[in-house]
Amino acid sequence: MTQEILKDTQSRMKKSVQTLEADLTKIRTGRANVSLLDHIEVEYYGAMVPLSQAANVNVTDHRTLSIQIWERDMVAKIEKAIINSDLGLTPNTAGQNIHINLPPLTEERRKEMVKVVKNEGEQAKIAVRNIRRDANQSLSKLLTQKEISEDEQRKSEEEIQKITDHFVAEIDKVLMAKEKELMEL
């Protein structure tokens, strides 16, 4: 029973770290990244679909994204979706291709982004701690139902704390990498 709680705790904490990593890819750094446009949706035959389902997005160089659009009539819709996004990007259209030059971030903007990254990291740490609390409550419930002994509970709580420490360190590592990426010129 305690093994199930430990496995569930570990998988939920791993998902928290993966969610943090996914959220951080949406934060614009000075470097081009195809995931920057992942959240942009365009109208495609009456339905809203992710940009990646209407075009190929590639990194041309460290500051340029290239979008190859599959259908000519989608060019204007995709261009409009990029302009209307919260990324502040200006697309340059050439036939069925759109090129996006990413302007370098100002020092002030970089510092703002670092604050956002730290906030995202803190939210992930809170999620991990909440998962730890839930697991410890499950162990307490098993103890009151006499399904485990106090020694098993204590040993499992120590194991949960080790798992928590591991994932908090993992979050710190992800945050440091993103902050370093943001502060690079």
Curated annotation (Swiss-Prot):
One of its GO terms (biological process) is cytoplasmic translational termination. GO terms for molecular function: ribosomal large subunit binding. The keyword Protein biosynthesis applies. GO terms for cellular component: cytosol. It comes from the Bacteria. It holds the Pfam family RRF. CDD domains: RRF. Its main location: cytoplasm. It is found in: Cytoplasm. Keywords: Cytoplasm, Protein biosynthesis. Belongs to the RRF family. Responsible for the release of ribosomes from messenger RNA at the termination of protein biosynthesis. May increase the efficiency of translation by recycling ribosomes from one round of translation to another. This is Ribosome-recycling factor. It comes from Dichelobacter nodosus (strain VCS1703A).
